[in-house]
Amino acid sequence: MQGDDFAAWAMRPLAVAALIAGLTLPLIARAETAAPVCNAPSDLIRLANPLSHLAQKLASRETITIVAMGSSSTAGAGASSPTASYPSRLAVELKGHFPGQKIIVLNRGVNGEEVADMLKRFDQSIIAEKPDLVLWQLGTNSVIRDAMFNDNGAAIRAGLAKIRAAGADIVLMDPQFAPKVIVKPEATHMVELIATTAKSEGVDLFRRFEVMQRWYEVDHLAFEAFVAPDGLHMNDWSYACLAKSLGLAIAEAAQRPVVSATAMPHIVP
C-alpha cells in the first residue's frame, strides 16, 4: 500500500468518528437544554373582572387594538429578538384564541422608565392609539432603584383614570420575580401596593410576580431557566410562557359572562 493510500485509509475512521460526534453533540445539547413546561394554575392567572370593552369588539368583529405600556420587560430586554418579547408573543397567542379576528398589539415599552416617566407619554403612546385594552406593566424600576412610591399609589390611579376615560379595559402587571428584584426589601411592598390599587380601582391585575415565583418555588425551575443572565430581565422562554398565560387569561375574561365564576382549564404546553 502506497504512503498516500495508507494515510487516506488511516484517516477514514477518524473522519467517521468526527462525523458521528458532529451529529451526536447537537442531539445531546438539545436534550440538556429542553425547555421547561409552561404551567400556571387557572386560579393564579384568572383576571378578577370581565373585559367588557374587548368583549364588545369581539362580538362586532371589529379590529382590536391592545397597547402594552411599560418598561424594559415590555420592550423585550433579555429576549433574543423583538419577536420574542411578550407583546409580540401575545399577539400570536390571541390570534390563536380568536381566528379571523384582526388583533393589533402595540409595544410601548421603554427601558428604564418608572411610572412618572410613563405618565408623561400616556397621550402619545396610549390615548392616541384609541386602544380597546391597555396592559400596564409597572413597579420594577422603582424597586431596583430603591425609589418606592411615596404617594400611596396616587400616580397609578392618575394613569388608570386617564385610560378609563379613553374607554379601554385595563390590566395591570406587577414586577417580575427575579434575583435583582427579590433581593430588594421593598419588592413585596410594591407587589402589594399594585394589587391593592388594582382592587380599589376595580381593574384587573395579572400577577406576574406570583406566576414566576411559582416557577421557582413549586415547579423548581432554576432562575437560569426563566431569567436572563443579567439576573433581572426575562428570557425567550419566560416571555413566551407569560404571553401564553396572559393570552389565556384575556381570552377567558373577554368571553366570560358577568355572573360566571367558572374556572379556566390549565394551560396545555
Question: Model segments located where?
Answer:
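N-terminal secretory targeting modules
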Residues: 1-67, 76-80, 95-101, 129, ...
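Short, solvent-exposed loop/turn elements at domain surfaces
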Residues: 74-78, 115-116
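Soluble periplasmic/extracytoplasmic beta-strand elements of cell-envelope proteins
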Residues: 65-67, 106, 169
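Alpha-helical cap/lid subdomain in secreted, periplasmic
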Residues: 88-104, 113-269
